[in-house]
UniProtKB/Swiss-Prot annotation:
This is DNA-binding protein MNB1B. GO terms for cellular component: nucleus. PANTHER family: DNA-BINDING PROTEIN MNB1B (PTHR46261:SF18), HIGH MOBILITY GROUP B PROTEIN 4-RELATED (PTHR46261). It comes from Zea mays. CDD domains: HMG-box_AtHMGB1-like.
Amino acid sequence: MKGAKSKGAAKADAKLAVKSKGAEKPAKGRKGKAGKDPNKPKRAPSAFFVFMEEFRKEFKEKNPKNKSVAAVGKAAGDRWKSLSESDKAPYVAKANKLKLEYNKAIAAYNKGESTAAKKAPAKEEEEEDEEESDKSKSEVNDEDDEEGSEEDEDDDE
């Protein structure tokens, strides 16, 4: 003879049932993430990342056996903190130059994207208008012919 489940076992079963129900239903309102456009310009690096490009080369020359990315990042961060503002100035200037180039590139990209987006629907609308106008012309001609023949018949009576 089977006995009743304990309260703890009943709760555990209820939790499992809730979890399985939740797993079966997809989330409402959530859509897949939009893919990245491969033509979009890459964001300009900050002054620190401009510094990192140079520092990586130096670090690899001094420590060829050390392949750890974390070690390179840690050493670069320590070195960057120890630099004075005047030492950081060339990196900041280069970063600003790259940022200006990026802003121009992204403006051109957005301009091209917006005009392409506007042109594509416009072409579709034009094609639809052409199709409708062709249909309407032939339908109008057909209707005129039919109306004329009906009127002729009415006149005869």
